[in-house]
A protein has these predicted regions:
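N-terminal secretory signal peptides that target proteins for export/translocation
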Residues: 1-11
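Charged, low-complexity intrinsically disordered terminal segments
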Residues: 28-177, 183-529
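Intrinsically disordered/low-complexity terminal segments and short unstructured peptides
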Residues: 7-8, 25, 223
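Bacterial N-terminal signal peptides
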Residues: 14-25
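ATP-binding N-terminal substructure of ATP-dependent carboxylate-amine bond-forming enzymes
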Residues: 2, 15, 39
Length: 529
């Protein structure tokens, strides 16, 4: 398969490109592009499909509610996607920010082509920043009569795309961060996972602790509507209009994907999926679901073309309305967490009212983007002083935890799930981080599910894992030459009593990484992070 620039590298470099553009003073804005492709929409007559009839039977007694299943394990998340693609009869719609060039992405592409060969319509919408230079493969796939591929907010230069960051920074630094996967307009998955090994427990070195939710019924139709909004936007450009060079034939691409799926690595990974309980549930049509009402919220794609301060196209105000009534507890997981003064103030208000506020984010050692950690670090003392319980994910579980059972499938972990549980009654799952980039610059999607059972189970599981997978931060008063001052400490609460892991210094982070975070923290770039 073709291997070009790595999407993970692209993700890490974006904050630094933003910084460079800011220093150079480039802030050009573009006129909205013209529509380049014919419109197409979700197929509505899919009730007769295998999925449609199965879901209709299971939803009979649930009064227009949707059925939900959290996918907190990477293997489960990939297995469900493969089985849904195998079951597809009418359509598959995929929207993602990153599309790696590795074992799981090639398996994913292989299953898409197999579905297309059966007559299933496939629409694949990728942000142009995150496909890893795989345009020959993607354009070849798009030559299939049943496959369409569009790139969102494409760069004008196909050879040096980052150059656009310097000449058209205000638009090209803003990306489509949504992740959706919908089959036959009947079942849909949204959440934090892109397409690649680190998201699906296939990378032995680094694994993302992530979360998706599978939803069937009315929820799927809402996700289809969001997909259509992006697919038919002028920023979604067919790959054939962008890639003009010679392509591998569809036959050659099909053979390459088949060969990749039969490789030793792919077969070893697929073998790990066969023993999953969720596989048996799906094949026996006995998937355990939580039936509940939900609200789907997403940014309009016009967000990328308007002033960041104009929130008319933003999902954040709607999300705040859905989650503003807090009584007892807020559990927040955000891998990239830069709360700003307003959110710190809201946390303080909740604490004054007697509510518990707990936040889990990445430690510097676990964070894959040091620049983002720099923005977050400024707020730690204020968060703790406001009464927030602040936890940071370790890059590895505690020594007394059985690593063979850890949920990430890798030797090192990085948090990537974006979820919130409010009063153990409502749960948010989506692609949105609590940082300025997600709120004001990129586009995002998420769902608020009103289910005490689902939210309660998620909260209990989350709190049970914390002591072995995260450090708790506290402020202690220390004395020195210039008087007393507050100092951060990191605690391992998996021991009894808790032990201090580090005092005043980011644990398990090397000197260079600490310097990066410190230096970027001196610069006025928080709004870009």
């Amino acid at each position: 398969m073709h291997r070009h620039r790595r999407p993970t590298t692209a993700l890490r470099v974006l904050p630094y490109l933003s910084l460079l553009a800011l220093l150079l003073g480039t802030a050009c804005s573009s006129q909205p592009p013209q529509q380049l492709a014919p419109a197409s929409y979700a197929m509505t007559d899919t009730g007769h499909t295998f999925l449609g009839t199965a879901i209709e039977r299971s939803s009979t007694d649930h009064d227009q509610k949707s059925g939900f299943r959290l996918l907190n394990n990477g293997l489960d998340a990939f297995a469900v996607r493969l089985l849904l693609m195998e079951a597809a009869e009418a359509s598959i719609d995929v929207q993602t920010y990153l599309y790696h060039d590795d074992v799981t992405s090639q398996l994913f592409s292989h299953y898409l082509i197999r579905a297309a060969d059966r007559g299933v319509r496939v629409r694949l919408l990728l942000d142009d920043f995150g496909h890893g230079g795989q345009e020959p493969l993607l354009a070849s796939m798009a030559s299939h009569p049943n496959v369409s591929v569009r790139l969102f907010n494409p760069f004008s230069s196909r050879t040096v795309p980052y150059l656009d960051m310097l000449t058209d920074f205000s638009e090209k630094s803003r990306r489509m961060h949504n992740k959706t996967f919908t089959v036959d307009n009947q079942a849909a998955i949204i959440g934090g996972r892109n397409i690649g090994d680190t998201y699906f427990a296939a990378d032995p070195i680094t694994g993302f602790a992530d979360l998706d939710v599978l939803g069937v019924g009315p929820f799927a139709r809402k996700i289809s509507a969001s997909f259509d909004t992006y697919w038919n936007h002028a920023l979604a450009v067919p790959i054939a209009t962008l890639w003009q060079e010679e392509l591998p034939s569809l036959t050659a691409t099909r053979q390459a994907l088949t060969s990749s799926s039969e490789s030793e690595k792919a077969q070893a990974y697929l073998a790990r999926l066969t023993s999953l309980g969720i596989i048996d549930e799906l094949r026996q049509q006995q998937l355990e679901l939580h039936w509940a009402r939900s609200d789907v919220v997403y940014d309009h794609p016009d967000k990328l073309l308007t002033d960041p301060d104009d929130d008319a196209s933003h999902m954040a105000p709607e999300l705040v309305k859905l989650l503003q009534d807090l009584d007892n507890e807020a559990l927040i997981i955000s891998p990239y967490f830069i709360p700003g003064d307003a959110l710190v103030g809201r946390f303080a208000d909740w604490r004054t009212q007697g509510a518990r506020v707990l936040v889990l984010t990445n430690s510097l050692a676990a964070n894959d983007v040091a620049a983002v950690h720099a923005g977050y670090a400024h707020y730690r003392e204020a968060l703790l002083e406001a009464g927030t319980e602040l936890w940071e994910l370790r890059p590895r579980p505690s020594l007394h935890e059985d690593r063979s059972s850890q949920p990430f499938g890798s030797s090192r972990a990085s948090l990537h799930a974006k979820t919130m549980v409010f009063d153990r009654r409502k749960i948010f799952v989506g692609s949105m981080n609590l940082d300025p980039r997600s709120v004001n610059l990129n586009t995002e999607i998420g769902a608020v599910i009103d289910s005490s059972e689902m939210a309660g189970n998620a909260a209990e599981g989350f709190l049970k894992l914390l002591p072995d997978y995260a450090w708790r931060l506290q402020l202690v008063e220390t004395s020195g030459l210039f008087g007393n001052r507050a100092e951060l400490i990191w605690l391992d609460t998996g021991h009894s009593p808790p032990t201090v892991v580090s005092e005043g210094k980011e644990p398990e982070a090397g000197l260079w990484r600490r310097f990066q975070a410190w230096f970027i923290g001196l610069l006025p770039v928080e709004s870009l992070l």
